[in-house]
């Protein structure tokens, strides 16, 4: 596969020479995701995917077909986006993809934790799964004795997974550095059936691949799929997808950009690993949850009924209210956000604390509106400074296109747009998010205008409805079931869980509870003294240092980080996602 793509991109250049050099390099698909170490790269596709035999053969067949029909042209390339591996049965004139059975059919999806994971890894995995569950109809259930088709999370040498359901035990590696919630969300997205965003057939409309800066033998990692290989369920391309490559994916020096957004204001948006975007969620809901809600969709501004709770709307970022009719509530100790009316005179918005510096953990949402025949002009003023990173982590986001459900321009660092920006319609959404740094912030002004704006295609309308109830009412739960056995015998390394059943169509609250368990410290490993003593031998075979001190240090019963042994019990002052017994 790599050799064919290399030949198509570079002609007579010798692949084996490039591969020999490139195989020694670690690679990265986003600055916000840990690197893939060189010893794993021969086994992974696009940096973090284990392909099935069928998937690999389909990609090879597609490459060979393109090579035959387009020898004089250049191979199309693009960027990672959430795409499905299978097609729906109702698509006329189109067969199922070879991997149609990669869709999960049995719910809840069972998963278990390997003993290699510590409690902090487990906490972050649970947080990521809860984000998927609260926004989709997909449900997960922890079962340490799982059999049949199930996911096993383990600590491998990096972050990687498979695309879609393989059958039987299916691993997701959450190695060191992969504990970030957005990274885990990304890998679970693969397991549910999502490809990288830039793999979409329409990616080249939004992204340009700069092959001069790509590690040569990895040019294959930028190929697009055809419409016959994947389906997007008519969900638009999303430059803010958690599944998208970053700007420097597979870069020869990890600094030069290999992906350029056609709209330069999106350049620092791609590659985020914070959380799911609105269209990440919608894609999974279209694939798995279509028709779960039977009620009329009265959600506004691109929102739709939440298949996890059909009495509520899933709203695009920046929108809130019961029907997505207003601005989303802000999260800040400082007053910010609101719904504002643009008039002919300039009005001003600024970040909390401007210009003396914004606090951390701030989310502000503004919805600006004017009359329907008018537009909104926005211009930045005075000093500008937002924590700088190649993919914006802290940012001001401007949603000013025709599609306010899609991710907007995310702007950070110290160069503000010089010219005024004009919205495509009578609404504009402004989001300020700060989680990492403290910097100057921003100040902007806005007013209504009749100036023209460049527009993008509008979206198809979505209609969803609510499910038939088995018991009249809502929030009727069964009693909690019995606690499962603890996954580990000691050291506060394990968890136990219990389940309850929702007896109505909708229930608020959690289906499964977790507890950290077996908080007694683990007994001393009898091998500890041998290992410690051996590590103290000098090169000439004589004993170095003071082995007695080392032996005493490993004679205490042990606990899993971040717990410490206090009188034989494992304790910690750090806040955890999993309640302690």
From Swiss-Prot:
One of its GO biological process terms is:
proteolysis
Domain TSP type-1 per the UniProt entry, residue ranges: 474-523
- InterPro entries in UniProt: Astacin-like_dom, CUB_dom, EGF-like_dom, MetalloPept_cat_dom_sf, Peptidase_M12A, Peptidase_Metallo, Sperma_CUB_dom_sf, TSP1_rpt
E.C. code: 3.4.24.-
Q: What does the record say about activity regulation?
A: Inhibited by 1,10-phenanthroline.
Q: Which GO terms describe its molecular function?
A: metalloendopeptidase activity; zinc ion binding
Propeptide residue numbers? Answer: 1-95
CC per GO annotation: extracellular region
User: Which cysteines does the record link by disulfide bonds?
Assistant: 137-289, 159-178, 293-313, 315-324, 336-364, 486-517, 490-522, 502-507
All copies of the CUB domain together span 336-449
Q: Which cofactor does it need?
A: Zn(2+)
Name the positions where Zn(2+) binds. Answer: 186, 190, 196
Q: Where in the cell is it found?
A: Secreted
User: Matching PROSITE patterns, A to Z?
Assistant: ASTACIN, CUB, EGF_1, EGF_2, TSP1, ZINC_PROTEASE
Q: Give start and end of each EGF-like domain.
A: 285-325
Manner of cofactor binding, per the entry note: Binds 1 zinc ion per subunit.
User: Which residues are tagged as glycosylated in the record?
Assistant: 67, 418
What the protein does? Answer: Metalloprotease. Involved in molting, a process during larval stages in which a new cuticle is formed and the old cuticle is shed.
Name of the molecule in the record: Zinc metalloproteinase nas-36
Q: Which organism is it from?
A: Brugia malayi (Filarial nematode worm)
State the encoding gene.
nas-36
């Amino acid at each position: 596969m790599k050799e064919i793509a290399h030949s198509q991109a570079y002609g007579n250049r010798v692949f084996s020479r490039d591969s020999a050099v490139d195989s020694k390099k670690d690679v990265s698909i986003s600055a916000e995701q840990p690197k893939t170490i060189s010893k794993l790269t021969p086994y992974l596709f696009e940096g973090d995917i284990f392909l099935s035999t069928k998937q690999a053969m389909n990609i090879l067949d597609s490459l060979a077909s393109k090579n035959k029909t387009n020898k004089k042209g250049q191979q199309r390339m693009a960027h990672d986006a959430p795409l499905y591996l299978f097609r729906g049965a109702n698509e006329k004139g189109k067969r199922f993809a070879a991997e149609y059975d990669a869709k999960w059919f049995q719910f809840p999806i069972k998963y278990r934790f390997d003993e290699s994971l510590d409690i902090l890894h487990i906490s972050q995995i649970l947080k990521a799964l809860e984000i998927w569950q609260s926004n989709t109809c997909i449900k997960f259930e922890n079962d340490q004795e799982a059999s049949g088709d199930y996911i096993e999370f383990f600590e491998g040498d990096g972050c990687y997974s498979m695309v879609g359901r393989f059958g039987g035990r299916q691993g997701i590696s959450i190695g060191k550095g992969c504990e970030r919630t957005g990274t885990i969300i990304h890998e679970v997205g693969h397991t549910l059936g999502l490809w990288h965003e830039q793999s979409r057939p329409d990616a080249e409309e939004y992204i340009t691949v700069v092959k001069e800066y790509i590690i040569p033998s990895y040019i294959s990692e930028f190929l697009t799929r055809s419409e016959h290989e994947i389906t997007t369920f008519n969900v638009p391309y999303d430059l803010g997808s958690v599944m998208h490559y970053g700007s420097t994916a597979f870069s020869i020096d990890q600094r030069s950009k290999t992906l350029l957004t056609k709209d330069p204001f999106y350049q620092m948006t791609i590659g985020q690993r914070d959380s799911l975007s609105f269209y990440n969620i919608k894609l999974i809901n279209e694939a798995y949850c279509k028709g779960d809600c039977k009620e009329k969709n009265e959600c506004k501004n691109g929102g739709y009924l939440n298949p996890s709770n059909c009495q509520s709307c899933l709203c695009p970022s920046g929108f809130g209210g019961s029907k997505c009719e207003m601005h989303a509530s802000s999260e800040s100790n400082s007053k910010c956000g609101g719904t504002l009316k643009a008039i002919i005179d300039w009005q001003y918005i600024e970040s909390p604390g401007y210009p003396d510096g914004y606090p951390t953990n701030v989310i502000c949402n503004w919805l600006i509106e004017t009359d329907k025949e008018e537009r909104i002009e926005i211009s930045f003023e005075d000093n500008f400074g937002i924590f700088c990173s190649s993919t914006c982590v802290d940012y001001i986001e401007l949603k000013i296109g025709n599609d306010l459900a899609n991710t907007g321009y995310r702007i950070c660092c110290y160069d503000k747009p010089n010219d005024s920006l004009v919205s495509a319609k009578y609404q504009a959404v402004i989001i300020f998010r700060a989680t990492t740094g403290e910097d100057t912030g921003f100040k902007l002004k806005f007013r209504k205008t009749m100036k023209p704006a460049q527009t993008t295609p509008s979206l198809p309308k979505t209609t969803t409805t609510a499910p038939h109830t088995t018991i009249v009412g809502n929030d009727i739960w069964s009693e909690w079931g019995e606690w499962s056995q603890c996954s580990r015998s000691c050291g506060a390394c394990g968890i136990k869980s219990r389940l309850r059943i929702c007896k109505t169509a909708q229930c608020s609250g959690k289906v499964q509870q977790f507890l950290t368990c077996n908080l007694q410290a683990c007994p001393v490993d009898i091998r500890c003294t041998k290992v410690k003593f051996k590590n103290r031998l000098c090169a000439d075979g004589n004993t170095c240092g003071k082995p007695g001190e080392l032996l005493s240090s490993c004679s205490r019963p042990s606990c899993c980080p971040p717990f410490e042994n206090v009188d034989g019990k494992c304790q910690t002052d750090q806040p955890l996602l999993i309640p302690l017994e």
